[in-house]
Curated annotation (Swiss-Prot):
SS bond partners: none
UniProt source species: Acetivibrio thermocellus (strain ATCC 27405 / DSM 1237 / JCM 9322 / NBRC 103400 / NCIMB 10682 / NRRL B-4536 / VPI 7372) (Clostridium thermocellum)
PROSITE patterns (alphabetical): CLPX_ZB (PS51902)
Name of the protein described by the UniProt record: ATP-dependent Clp protease ATP-binding subunit ClpX
InterPro entries linked to this entry: AAA+_ATPase, ATP-dep_Clp_protease_ClpX, ATPase_AAA_core, Clp_ATPase_C, Clp_protease_ATP-bd_su_ClpX, ClpX_bact, P-loop_NTPase, Znf_CppX_C4
Role summary: ATP-dependent specificity component of the Clp protease. It directs the protease to specific substrates. Can perform chaperone functions in the absence of ClpP.
Biological process annotations from GO: cell division; proteolysis involved in protein catabolic process
Residue positions binding ATP: P117, T118, G119, S120, G121, K122, T123, L124
Gene Ontology molecular function: ATP binding; ATP hydrolysis activity; ATP-dependent protein folding chaperone; protein dimerization activity; unfolded protein binding; zinc ion binding
Keyword terms of this UniProt record: ATP-binding, Chaperone, Metal-binding, Nucleotide-binding, Zinc
UniProt family annotation: Belongs to the ClpX chaperone family.
Entry binding sites for Zn(2+): C12, C15, C34, C37
Chain ranges of the ClpX-type ZB domain: 1-53
Lineage: Bacteria, Bacillati, Bacillota, Clostridia, Eubacteriales
Length: 431
C-alpha cells in the first residue's frame, strides 16, 4: 500500500522517500514507485538477464560443420586446419558446459598449436573463431615476453589484454580465446638444457605453463611489472582457450630427418628438399619434432591439438583477393563506389598480384601492401577528376606500374583513356 504522512503527502511504497525528495513518482493502483527504485529494479533485472543470456550463449555452441562453414566465408583453403580447429573449439566449449552441469568425468583442455608459413591464415582463423563464438579475443606476441624479473612483459599481461577485450567482465573473459603469435620464437636455443639463463626462450615457456593448464592468475590492472603495493585482478584461466601460432621455420628439416631414417638403403626414394612441399611435410609432424625444435616437454604436453597449414598457391591467393566477404578487391571496389566510380580488375591483373605475393614470399599478408602500391596514384587522382565512370586495373598496371585505364562519361558519351595525358584516347559509344 502507498504511504502517506500526516499531510497526506505521497511517498514511494518501496523506499519511503517523499515526492519532493525524488525526481519522479509513478502511481499505480494503490502504490507509488520513485525513479530511483525503478532504476534499481532495472539494474537487478539486467544482471539476471545477462547471466541467463551468457548461459544460453554458452550452451548454444555451433556444430563443427557449422563452424567450418562460417570459416569458409572468410578463410580460403586450409580445409584440414579448419576441420581440426572446428572440432577442437567445439570440444573445448562442450567441456566448459560439462563443468557447468557437473560431471563425473574430468575433461582436459584442448589448447591448440598452429604451424604454418607467414601469411597462411593463422591469425585470421583465430580471429574468425572468436567472432563466430561471440567470446572475448586477444592477440599477444610471444617475442615481447620475458621471465619475471627481466626487462620485457610478464606473461600475465596477455591475460590483461583479454580482460580489456571483455570490458573488464572477468566472468566473460574466463571463457575467451587468446592467440599467442610467434610462439616458435620462444623455443630454447638448443635441445640440451644450457647453463646460461634463457629468459626469452625456455624461461617464458616455463612461465606460460600454469596459465595454459589452468590457474588463478593475479593480473596487474594497469599492466607492466608487478609490485607489492598494487591491487591485482584475479582470473581463472581453466576455461580460456589458448591458440599458439608460429611459422616454425626449419622444422620441416627435423621432420624430414626423422622420416628419412626409416627410408634408408638402395631401394629408398630420395626426394630433393627443394622439390618437397613444406605443407605436405608438416602433415607428418609429431610432438617429438616440436621438442627437437626447442619447445620443452611440459609446454608441448599442454598443447595437445597440433594443426598444420600449408603455403598458399596462386589459385588460393586469387580466391583470397576476390571471394571472401572481406576480400581486398571487394574492399577497394567499395571505396571507389563511395566516389561513384566503378573499379574493375582484369583477371590477368589479379593473377599478377598473386604472383608478386608468391615472389615476395609474404603469402596473403603481403597482398594488401602490393595493392596499396598499385592503387596509390589512382586513389590520389580520381577523387579530383570529374565525370570518371570506371577505372580498370590491367596486368601492365601490376607488373610495369603503367597507369590504369579510366572511362570518362561526358554528355552521355564514354571516352576510354589512360590516366596520363600522353596516352591515346579511344572514343566509345555510350551504352
Amino acid at each position: 500500500m502507498s504511504r502517506y504522512d500526516e499531510k497526506k503527502q505521497l511517498k514511494c511504497s518501496f523506499c519511503g522517500k517523499t515526492q519532493e525528495q525524488v525526481k519522479r513518482l509513478v502511481a499505480g493502483p494503490g502504490v507509488y514507485i520513485c525513479d530511483e527504485c525503478i532504476e534499481l529494479c532495472s539494474e537487478i533485472i539486467e544482471e539476471e538477464f545477462e547471466e541467463t543470456r551468457a548461459d544460453a550463449e554458452l550452451n548454444d555452441i555451433p556444430k563443427p560443420s557449422e563452424i567450418k562453414e562460417i570459416l569458409d566465408q572468410y578463410v580460403v583453403g586450409q580445409d584440414t586446419a579448419k576441420k581440426a580447429l572446428a572440432v577442437a573449439v567445439y570440444n573445448h566449449y562442450k567441456r566448459i558446459n560439462s563443468d557447468v552441469k557437473g560431471s563425473d568425468v574430468e575433461l582436459q583442455k584442448s589448447n591448440i598449436v598452429m604451424l604454418g608459413p607467414t601469411g597462411s591464415g593463422k591469425t585470421l582463423l583465430a580471429q574468425t573463431l572468436a567472432r563466430i563464438l561471440n567470446v572475448p579475443f586477444a592477440i599477444a606476441d610471444a617475442t615481447s615476453l620475458t621471465e619475471a624479473g627481466y626487462v620485457g612483459e610478464d606473461v600475465e599481461n596477455i591475460l590483461l589484454k583479454l580482460i580489456q577485450a571483455a570490458d573488464y567482465d572477468i566472468e566473460r573473459a574466463e571463457k575467451g580465446i587468446i592467440y599467442i603469435d610467434e610462439i616458435d620464437k620462444i623455443a630454447r636455443k638448443s635441445e640440451n638444457p644450457s647453463i646460461t639463463r634463457d629468459v626469452s626462450g625456455e624461461g617464458v615457456q616455463q612461465a606460460l605453463l600454469k596459465i595454459l593448464e589452468g590457474t588463478i592468475a593475479s593480473v596487474p590492472p594497469q599492466g607492466g611489472r608487478k609490485h607489492p603495493h598494487q591491487e591485482f585482478i584475479q582470473i581463472d584461466t581453466t576455461n580460456i582457450l589458448f591458440i599458439c601460432g608460429g611459422a616454425f621455420d626449419g622444422i620441416e628439416k627435423i621432420i624430414q630427418n626423422r622420416i628419412g631414417k626409416k627410408s634408408m638403403g638402395f631401394g629408398a626414394k630420395i626426394e630433393s628438399p627443394k622439390k618437397a612441399n613444406v605443407g605436405e611435410i608438416l602433415k607428418n609432424i609429431l610432438p617429438q619434432d616440436l621438442l627437437k625444435f626447442g619447445l620443452i616437454p611440459e609446454f608441448v604436453g599442454r598443447l595437445p591439438v597440433i594443426v598444420t597449414l600449408h603455403s598458399l598457391d596462386r589459385e588460393a591467393l586469387v580466391k583470397i583477393l576476390t571471394e571472401p566477404k572481406n576480400a581486398l578487391v571487394k574492399q577497394y571496389q567499395k571505396l571507389f563506389e563511395m566516389d561513384d566510380v566503378i573499379l574493375e580488375f582484369e583477371k590477368e591483373a589479379i593473377e599478377a598480384i598473386a604472383d608478386k605475393a608468391i615472389e615476395r614470399n609474404t603469402g596473403a599478408r603481403g597482398l594488401r601492401a602490393i595493392l596499396e602500391e598499385i592503387m596509390l596514384d589512382v586513389m590520389y587522382d580520381i577523387p579530383s577528376q570529374e565525370n570518371v565512370e570506371k577505372c580498370i586495373i590491367t596486368k601492365d598496371t601490376v607488373e610495369k606500374m603503367v597507369p590504369p585505364t579510366v572511362i570518362i562519361n561526358e554528355n552521355k558519351k564514354s571516352v576510354k583513356k589512360p590516366i596520363n595525358k600522353k596516352s591515346r584516347v579511344k572514343k566509345e559509344s555510350a551504352s
